[in-house]
């Protein structure tokens, strides 16, 4: 049995992923900030754990994720407040990576976005700038660690029903989008596939079944 800890467990992708993993027999712990979200998490088959990664230090996060085989970072400040974006999307994310190393949880899957990185190109006066900077810092740090990392880069997210098919790579264009269902399905396949370690997988909805698309990436 694979034991997976999802940080940001009440997010739309996280809830979908927890259900997929629990349905296939994995043990899932979903770490959430708000105790009122515990019921939603439990309905997926995951075990809710209330812990605020924004305020926990590295040791605190390590305690929350110890005894797991993999960590998925699916948390986010959700835009808006710039200081909180850096606190969650950069600083807490980096602490979670250090925590994974400390806890001996080698597998780490980061949900980022298509085009993330130091050359993200988002202007400073754009409301997305802080998020782009925070994700660039977190992803760059993750690549420097000894973790068995994979970074997922979905394009613009939708709530359309999942097709189970994606297109990996290519250049990002304005019309690109991908369903949250498909992102969760990609994360589930990645967790079960060691060949995706040390890969950055950028993708849209497409025509290739997810297992095949990831085999070719």
Residue ranges of predicted features:
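N-terminal Rossmann NAD(P)H-binding glycine-rich loop of SDR-like oxidoreductase domains
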Residues: 3-26
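Conserved Rossmann-fold NAD(P)-dependent oxidoreductase catalytic core, especially the SDR/UDP-sugar
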Residues: 27-31, 35, 77-87, 91-144, ...
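NAD(P)H-binding glycine-rich loop region in Rossmannoid oxidoreductase-like domains
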Residues: 30-95, 99-102, 191-195
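Active-site beta-alpha turn of Rossmann-fold NAD(P)-dependent dehydrogenases/reductases
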Residues: 75, 109-112, 155, 204
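Substrate-positioning beta->alpha
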Residues: 93, 134, 152, 174-189, ...
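Short-chain dehydrogenase/reductase
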Residues: 200-208
